[in-house]
């Protein structure tokens, strides 16, 4: 039996949170938000360290857009911009030797080009980081010699997660739940297929799972498999997590993430129906964005309502009841934008009590 760590037990053990989800679902952004909200944010040295990564994101963005123009049959809006296109392509995927004035001038020229913008609008047809538009719109700021990344810049900086990351922080416990301070350990593991074999290393003793879904990815494919839809992969992965016998005792909270990008994509004409035909029969209320987000939520709710297909270990079977044989298990859903600190603060406050209640209920206290 696991204790959740309250004073009444004579010790204060950490509540362990595990972030799960496919690649680029926003898990690492949540880790950064916890640092902002609970560990005094980023130091000067950490901000300086991010400058290079952010400029690498700029190059990755413009290079990926430009190199996909020919395969998509898109020409430059102006032929006079061809030298800038050639310059970026010659830099290759690794970027230029130096991020100097010449480099940023070429990026600026291309980002203003109508053909480049058209290719950007079709970015669901190739791989492009979510923060491409954000950083390319800020070229004038990012090229300055005295540029210092803001929290917003760092939150949007994309670096692939490899292995296991851990962050520790403390949170005040509501007076209604005995008060005091609670330690939290949050684990982030890489979400791409090649990283998932490492997940089992952190399953032991997990109190709650935050499963992140990139809702705006409904029309995109995986980086590691161009034949698989990202949202369909998330649904499959979520079902595996939901049915895993190693995680039966962990509370489960689903973050339907990237709502800002989802809304923007829908408002620009993107439709989930082309990839999920069952959406055409969806009768939910509201405008197209609300209907789309609620439809995605319902697909994940449907997973939780399926009968568990994997047998429980004999030693645990007597502890779980659902209908005739399966455990009743709640799953909570939140619409989130992981890059929005105020949104994450609100959601964490709401989920904090859920997590504590779940931990207490596991030991029969609440």
Per-region residue spans from a language model:
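TerminUS-proximal long segments
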Residues: 255, 326, 335-336, 348
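Glycine-rich phosphate-binding P-loop
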Residues: 16-38
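PEST-like, low-complexity acidic/proline-rich intrinsically disordered segments
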Residues: 1-9
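Conserved GTPase G-domain signal focused on the G5
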Residues: 21, 26-27, 338-355
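Switch- and interface-adjacent substructures of P-loop NTPase systems
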Residues: 8-11, 37-250, 258-329, 339-344, ...
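Conserved beta-strand scaffold positions in the cores of enzyme catalytic domains, especially
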Residues: 17, 331-335
